[in-house]
Design a protein with these regions (language model features):
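Basic, amphipathic alpha-helix used for nucleic-acid engagement in HTH/winged-helix/SANT-Myb modules
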Residues: 1-21, 28, 33-87, 132-138
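A detector of tandemly repeated sequence units and domain arrays
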Residues: 27-34, 93-100
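Short, basic interhelical loop/turn and adjoining N-cap
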Residues: 36-53, 99-122
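Residue-identity detector for glutamine
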Residues: 86, 104, 126-129
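C-terminal engagement modules used by replication, chromatin/transcription, nuclear envelope/ESCRT
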Residues: 117-138
Length: 138
């Protein structure tokens, strides 16, 4: 279970709602392709995991070629930001730098459209169930 799954879901639903409300005509096949490439509030990875991968990258001890392309792209973006931040804050550890970087807005969600579709459908189903539960209580 992912550490930030609820927050990531809320952020993805924000992007979904934002995109849907901006459309005159909605093509569901396009929705998920677009929202996964919309900016995200942060990088959806734990600071511990990011620090492990980034420190291994800095030592040349990790093979990113075995990673799925989106994860690889995300870690490369984090690595580039950590590298720049390290010049500004040389006294900080890699863990501290990673924690700062992953809290920054990310250029996208680093999810496949298929994963986003599954997540959005699950969230909408939960939302509908909660709405029905509230209606029954009235």
């Amino acid at each position: 279970i992912m550490e930030y799954s609820k927050e990531r879901m809320d952020d993805l639903m924000r992007a979904y709602d934002e995109y849907i409300s901006s459309c005159d005509y909605i093509r569901m096949s396009e929705v998920y392709k677009i929202i996964v490439n919309m900016p995200s509030r942060r990088f959806w990875v734990s600071d511990i995991r990011a620090a492990l991968i980034i420190s291994a990258m800095m030592r040349g001890k990790t093979d990113l070629s075995t990673m799925c392309p989106l994860k690889k792209e995300m870690y490369e973006e984090i690595y580039n930001r950590v590298f720049k931040l390290q010049e500004e804050y040389p006294e900080l550890t890699i863990s501290e730098l990673c924690a700062k970087v992953i809290a920054q807005p990310a250029p996208k969600f680093y999810l496949t459209p298929g994963s986003a579709k599954v997540m959005v459908c699950k969230a909408r189903k939960q939302w509908i169930q909660e709405k029905w539960k509230r209606l029954r209580l009235l």
